[in-house]
Structures are given as C-alpha cells and as structure tokens.
C-alpha cells in the first residue's frame, strides 16, 4: 500500500542517516529494480542526497570508475553482484556497503523458499550490512526532510551518449516531477488504482521516471519484475492483467508471438508503450494487429526521448497515434528541427537535427562542463535546447514528428 511505502521510505531514510548520509552526498547503487531500491530513491531525496545508478552487469573495473567519479562513501548493491562490488570498492572512497537480496521483500514462506533454492554463498567483509540489519540501525533516528529544492540532483544516470565517452546525466527533482505532471496533464488513459507492470531497470532514466515516479504520482499500483525473463513476459501479463506497461520494442514483439496469449482477451490493456530503442514500421504493424485482434482499444504507444530529458519528450498514445510517428511533445516541452550545428530552425517537413527544450531537461553532465555545453545550448529564445547529434528528424503540420 502507499501507506506502507511511506513507512518504508522513512525507515530507509533513518537508516541512511544512521550511516552518516547527509545533504549533498552521493550514494552508488548497483542493482536491478527492487522495492528496496525504490525506498532508497525517495529516502535519499528526503535527506537531500543523490543516487548514482550503475548497471549491475558492469565489470568490477567499470563499477569502480563510476564510484570514483562521484566519490561515494556508501555503496548499496544486490547480493549476486557483491563479489564484483567488493573488488570495485577497494582503494576507493567507499566506507560502508549495504547488501540487499531479492528475498528481502518477499513474504516469509517465499523468502525461505528463495534462500533454499538460491543460497547466498558470499563471504562479506566487516564493513558490510545486510538490508535488514541496515534498517535496524536506523531505529531511534527521525530525519526531517530537507526543504524542497527543484534543482537538487536526485539521480546520476550513466549513458554512452551521442558524443562518445560515457557521461553521468544529472536529473533533478524538477525533471522527475515535471515529467509526471506532463503525463498527468496529457493522458486520460491513466487512472488511480490501475496496475502497471514495471520490467525496466533502475539504472536508465526510462525505468525510474516512467516506471516508478510517474505511476506513483498518478496513484497506480506498480508490479515490479526485478529480472525479467522475456520468455515469461506473456505469462506475467496474463497473470497480473496490468493496464499499463513501459518496455522496449522487443518486449511487445515477444508478446505478439507468445502462444500462451493466443485467443486470450486482452481488453484490460489501456496503454502499453515502447521506448528505449528503435521501432521498425513492420514491428509496429505486427504488434498493432496483435493488440487489435485481442480486444485492445488502442495501438502500441511510443515516443521519443533521451536520458538527457529524463526519458520522454514526445508521445504517441491513445487516439493520437500515427503509424511511424513518435507523436507530439509533452506539455510545456518544445521540440523543434534545426539545421545541424546551427540555431536555424527548419520549416515543417524538412529533415534536420532534433532539439528539445522543456522542464525535464537535465542539469548537465556530472563534472563534464565542456560536454554539457556541447549538447545544452542557449538559443535566441532564451531557453536551453538539448541537441541530439547524429539524428534525423522531420516535423509535420499537426505537430507530429518522425525520427530515424
């Protein structure tokens, strides 16, 4: 329940405070999406701290680089990646490590079953706290929320970017809140109490902004799948019957080909959206035929965005969904097509470089001002525009946009 979520966030905030976390600190998190990671996201924000989100598939050396970049004193990781994280944290600023397990949020019977089938064979160092011991350490602490600062960096999300080297994208509280409000203002498809299936990881902006924060703001019930087996996606959809899902195009191609869903009534689906990767016209048509044949009212939703704008900037959903288009801009978001490497806006129908300006625009790249200045440029209108280099976009008369 939402009441329990608030309780868990406060307990996590107390535990973080007990470990000395304070405003301005950056906590590195190496994990898939779990309830504990969600609690940590909001608990850190309550204290004015920031999460540095790292893909658990990285090597020990890769994890070390991201730890060193932000100088984290606290590392939170999934138990299955602890050996790599232990190696990564050596000779870094890390002082304490908190280890979580997929069993931490399971009911007792399931947790026991999980531990029997997936025993934890790690040998933990003396600076490690398991999640339950970590939470227990917070007893007696009652942290007060820091005053709301819209420009507070709540997460650093890493991306290879379009200009070469990996970069840490700083997304603010305002970015996440604005995106949630943009969806709320634009879409009539989301209603309090509906279910959303979250199959996206926390270390991409799409996973947190669209998969966690936006649905919570709208009062949705989120079903978290920490480590999706694509072969079981159809079974999950049929079991939980979620009205909403955010995924990548291959997820929906998998659903369309799943024999389990043959002849099933899927009319409970309201808005299944594809992002995070390219969607071919043929794949879109295949998925749309599947949805229509199974009683779904609307075709596959899709959009366009970048990590640098907290994931989505345009959306094609519901009845406003043209085949092959990435849709229209979200509320308060300006999407324009410019002559490459210039500030010259192109007429409707001409191809050029896509530029995005709006409330979800990143604060910048962490400790990389030169790279930030390359992609965030102040145009004559006085706004910062996020340039997407190497893309090919075209705007149409009804504000629809295609991107290749």
Place the predicted regions along the sequence by residue.
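Conserved ATP-dependent adenylate/AMP-binding module captured primarily in the ANL superfamily
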Residues: 58-92, 179-197, 229-243
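Structural core segment of the AMP-binding/adenylate-forming
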Residues: 18-19, 46-133
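Conserved AMP-binding/adenylation subdomain of ANL enzymes
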Residues: 177-195, 203-246, 254, 258-259
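Short hydrophobic alpha-helices that are characteristic scaffold elements of the AMP-binding
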Residues: 42-47, 69, 204, 213-217
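Gly/Ser/Thr-rich phosphate-binding loop
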Residues: 243-247, 256-323, 334
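Conserved AMP-binding/adenylate-forming
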Residues: 2-4, 8, 12-58, 70
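Conserved adenylate-forming
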Residues: 16-22, 139-151, 156-198
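Conserved ATP-binding/catalytic segment of the ANL
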Residues: 19, 30, 344-349, 355-404
